[in-house]
């Protein structure tokens, strides 16, 4: 933290306010506000600078005082907003500050150690602060909050009396000024004296251990910048206020104050120690029970941007982090990355499960619901449209690398509407399909050309090397069974059961994954398809099948490609030689059923080709490889190394070997 405003001597006018850092040491100096505008941020030119804290924006906020009325406002200029009293999130807006407000530049509910908070006090009251009252306030703010767990300490806490001026200030409603983050110890207690109009108080003795002035008690001492003289008073009376103990070392929630009809401040709290309630007198509007244990469900359902329960939440893909739709709408205008992990966002989707959980949670905890005004504001700030939630989805034919990975854009909405409009599937060999096609043709054409024309359906011709010229002479029965090609998503007659009886029927599925493909039946028409189904020995894997072919190790794969290029060999040569070695029993595949004649799809064929290529590279004599390749030591983890995808590690060690360390 740097104070650039103090580098120059301040003007002769009196300071109009000051900032006290929460959790500060006793001797840490206060920050006096004497300029009309006081800027706070990470930028070094700010009056209060945090150059090393990346959670603070460059220009986070600024405090401005009206010289005529004395009103102080906070204007937020940050990215994530400024939190006031843990209740009000100010984002790109101005907020009227009152004495006793706590300004959170960084507020992490689940990581309080990262919080950066300051207590604002006004010094523009009728009576200025004396040095004695200042020291007394610092004593209350910092000293008594420390853990007094030593024996004999804290038996008789000193509770200060308030002057009539300070009590008059307390009669006006003030924002919550909880400073529970000031309690650094694992076991603390929060106490609050009950004040009367005559300035009377009750003291408490919590035994030899934890004693501290309550957060609200401390904030009341600095309301409107006026402090009363402190006088220690000891009483033998039993405690009339409660202690809040937390075994989980979680943050304590401040108890709510209520005003009586005659102006007295009713701060009756309920005793929660050992399940007993205090004997304090309560009115008809009793304060609700404070939770002893933290609500894990609430923490799970909290948006990290607004630090409140999720509202109309959306999830980002692929990272699946969830935020309020309104909160993320403001974020996505500035960045296309996830606010949590900075992963590029590919898609936005509604998270119906979390929305239902939030709704069920609010039924059990209606007090934690957002206000109607807040809900209307969030709905108005929601810029996520239905088009963003249902974009064109890029569906890939395979998860493997290769030239057949050209993508096809399909819409979820289109597929749903087509299912509704068609009572059953009609393929090119259905009688209904042929009848419609003949009616749409201007002149008769041969049936073979008709089948080829309709097969294209307006798409570019298939790049398959073995595209059948005509569909088999077959007609589907009425409402017959159909299979959808995994490559082109077009229907075809499901004749797989018939093939078991008649081998002349063309194969329609992969022998390994059992997924249906139409290439061998009548030729796949998808653009870029090199033959999605074929016998292993005839499978067209494409020229890019050698990229990362050796366990995604690009360095080892480049060594193999250079070896083949110098000898005029291609991937087809590798496949042919490997299948011969497989037939002789020299090479092995993890799936023993696969031979050169096994009908495979592109994915399964590429996977088996990679297994054979590794064994092909393993059997290359060292004398035929460069010295820079053979001189590398073997990696301990061999072919199973997970770091071999990194270029530096792959160049340094040989990974065409078996694992020798930590092998079970």
Swiss-Prot record:
Comp. bias intervals (Polar residues): 174-202
Zinc finger (PBZ-type): 633-655
Gene Ontology CC annotation, any one: nucleus
Annotated region (Disordered), positions in chain: 170-220, 245-264, 389-413
Entry PTM: Poly-ADP-ribosylated. In addition to binding non covalently poly(ADP-ribose) via its PBZ-type zinc finger, the protein is also covalently poly-ADP-ribosylated by PARP1.
Gene that produces this protein: Chfr
Protein name: E3 ubiquitin-protein ligase CHFR
Domain notes: The PBZ-type zinc finger (also named CYR) mediates non-covalent poly(ADP-ribose)-binding. Poly(ADP-ribose)-binding is dependent on the presence of zinc and is required for its function in antephase checkpoint. The FHA domain plays a key role in the anti-proliferative properties of the protein and is involved in initiating a cell cycle arrest at G2/M. The FHA domain may be required to interact with phosphorylated proteins.
């Amino acid at each position: 933290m740097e104070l650039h405003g103090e580098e120059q001597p301040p003007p002769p006018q009196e300071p109009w306010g000051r900032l006290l850092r929460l959790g500060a040491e006793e001797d840490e100096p206060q920050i006096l506000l004497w300029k009309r505008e006081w800027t706070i941020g990470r930028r070094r030119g700010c009056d209060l600078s945090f150059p090393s804290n990346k959670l603070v924006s460059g220009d986070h906020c600024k405090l401005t005082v009206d010289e005529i009325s004395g009103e102080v406002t906070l204007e937020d200029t940050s990215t994530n907003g400024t939190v006031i009293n843990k209740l009000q999130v100010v984002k790109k807006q101005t907020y009227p500050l009152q004495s006793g407000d706590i300004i959170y530049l960084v507020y992490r509910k689940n990581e309080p150690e990262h919080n950066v908070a300051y207590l604002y006090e006004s010094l523009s009251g009728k009576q200025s602060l004396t040095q004695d009252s200042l020291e007394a306030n610092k004593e209350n703010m910092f000293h008594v909050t420390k853990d007094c767990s030593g024996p004999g300490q804290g038996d008789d806490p000193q509770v200060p009396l308030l002057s009539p001026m300070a009590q008059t200030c307390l009669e006006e409603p003030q924002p919550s000024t909880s400073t529970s983050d000031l309690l650094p110890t694992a076991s603390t207690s929060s106490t609050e004296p009950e004040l009367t109009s005559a300035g009377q108080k009750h003291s408490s003795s919590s035994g030899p251990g934890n004693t501290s002035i309550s957060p609200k008690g401390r904030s009341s001492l600095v309301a409107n910048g006026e402090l009363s003289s402190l006088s220690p008073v000891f009483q033998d009376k039993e405690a009339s206020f409660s202690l809040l103990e937390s075994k989980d070392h979680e943050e304590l929630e401040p108890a709510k104050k209520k005003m009586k009809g005659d102006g007295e401040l009713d701060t009756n709290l309920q005793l929660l120690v050992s399940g007993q309630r205090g004997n304090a007198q309560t009115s008809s509007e009793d304060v609700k029970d404070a939770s002893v244990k933290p609500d894990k469900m609430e923490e799970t359902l909290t948006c990290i941007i607004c630090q409140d329960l999720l509202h109309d939440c959306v999830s980002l893909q692929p990272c699946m982090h969830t935020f309020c739709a309104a909160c993320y709408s403001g974020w996505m205008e500035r960045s296309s990355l996830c606010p949590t992990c900075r992963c590029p966002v590919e898609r936005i989707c509604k998270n119906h499960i979390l929305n239902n959980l939030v709704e069920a949670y609010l039924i059990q905890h209606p007090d934690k619901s957002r206000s109607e005004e807040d809900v209307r504001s969030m709905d108005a700030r929601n810029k996520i449209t239905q088009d963003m939630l249902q974009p064109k989805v890029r569906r890939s034919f395979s998860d493997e690398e290769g030239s057949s990975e050209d993508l096809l854009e399909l819409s979820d909405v289109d597929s749903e509407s087509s299912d509704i409009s068609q009572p059953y599937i009609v393929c090119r060999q259905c009688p209904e399909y042929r009848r419609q096609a003949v009616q749409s043709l201007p002149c008769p054409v041969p049936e073979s050309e008709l089948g080829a024309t309709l097969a294209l359906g307006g798409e570019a011709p298939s790049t398959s090397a073995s595209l059948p010229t005509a569909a088999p002479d077959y007609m589907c029965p009425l409402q017959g069974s159909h299979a959808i090609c995994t490559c082109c998503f077009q229907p075809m007659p499901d004749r797989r059961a018939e093939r078991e009886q008649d081998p002349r029927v063309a194969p329609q599925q992969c022998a390994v994954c059992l997924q249906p493909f139409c290439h061998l039946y009548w030729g796949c028409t998808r653009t870029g398809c090199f033959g999605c189904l074929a016998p292993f020995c005839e499978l067209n894997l494409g020229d890019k099948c050698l990229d990362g072919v050796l366990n995604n190790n690009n360095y080892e794969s480049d060594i193999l490609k250079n070896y083949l290029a110098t000898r005029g060999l291609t991937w087809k040569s590798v496949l042919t030689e490997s299948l011969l070695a497989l037939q002789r029993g020299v090479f092995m595949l993890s799936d023993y059923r696969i031979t050169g004649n096994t009908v495979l799809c592109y994915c399964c064929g590429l996977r088996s080709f990679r297994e054979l290529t590794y064994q092909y590279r393993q059997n290359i004599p060292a004398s035929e490889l460069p010295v820079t390749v053979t001189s590398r030591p073997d990696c301990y983890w061999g072919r199973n190394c997970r770091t071999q995808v990194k270029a530096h590690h792959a160049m340094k060690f040989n990974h065409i070997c078996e694992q020798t360390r930590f092998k079970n």
